[in-house]
A protein has these predicted regions:
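Class II aminoacyl-tRNA synthetase catalytic cores and aaRS-like
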Residues: 1-183
């Protein structure tokens, strides 16, 4: 969605996009977001040509694959929109229980729904920033001759009693160094 919104090369061309429904207004306008940018892309559905069963399943939080043509928008809120040729429901969402609505939620509320919080503007922005920072750091070190090494992870967890904890130390535990007092 980010590439489509920020480039004219898709104008008057057919595209296929995936995302989650932020809003669905008047059985016609879908605001779709995939987390790649803050803005939603408006998808215009011809409700006379679209099956009623599909229209009923387009609810906030539903995952869709939209195929259609990118055109200049008739409205003033966005510069382009997608005229939907085909809409496929990849994952439904029950509007009665889907907790993320098009409003601002508290961080406490989002902690309680951690599996969905990346669908909010705040957390998707944090994810994009972290991704760009990590990439920049890795790129810097790569350009300066460093290697990225996956070190072993040593943890204190014992899954199902199948192992025993062991101590990792640089000291000789049978003959530890003593201080001036013999301790």
């Amino acid at each position: 969605i980010n590439h489509i919104l920020n480039s004219d090369k898709h104008l008057n061309k057919n595209v296929s996009i995936y995302g989650w429904v932020r809003t669905f207004r008047a059985n016609r306008f879908i605001a779709l977001n995939d987390g790649s940018c803050l803005n939603n892309i408006q998808c215009v559905v011809d409700f006379e040509k679209t099956e009623q069963e599909i229209l009923k399943k387009i609810t906030t939080g539903a995952a869709l694959n939209i195929k259609g043509k990118v055109v200049e928008s008739q409205g003033s809120q966005q510069s382009i929109e997608i005229m939907v040729d085909k809409c496929e429901i990849l994952g439904g969402s029950n509007p009665e229980v889907y907790p993320i609505q098009p409003k601002k939620h508290s961080f406490e509320f989002l902690r309680e729904n951690a599996h969905l919080r990346t669908r909010t503007n705040t957390f998707s922005a944090v994810m994009r920033i972290r991704s760009n920072l990590s990439f920049a750091i890795h790129e810097y070190f790569k350009k300066n001759g460093f290697y990225y090494v996956h070190t072993p992870i040593i943890t204190a967890s014992d899954a199902e009693g199948a192992g025993e904890q062991f101590r990792v130390s640089t000291l000789d535990m049978k003959n530890p160094p003593l201080n001036n007092y013999g301790q």
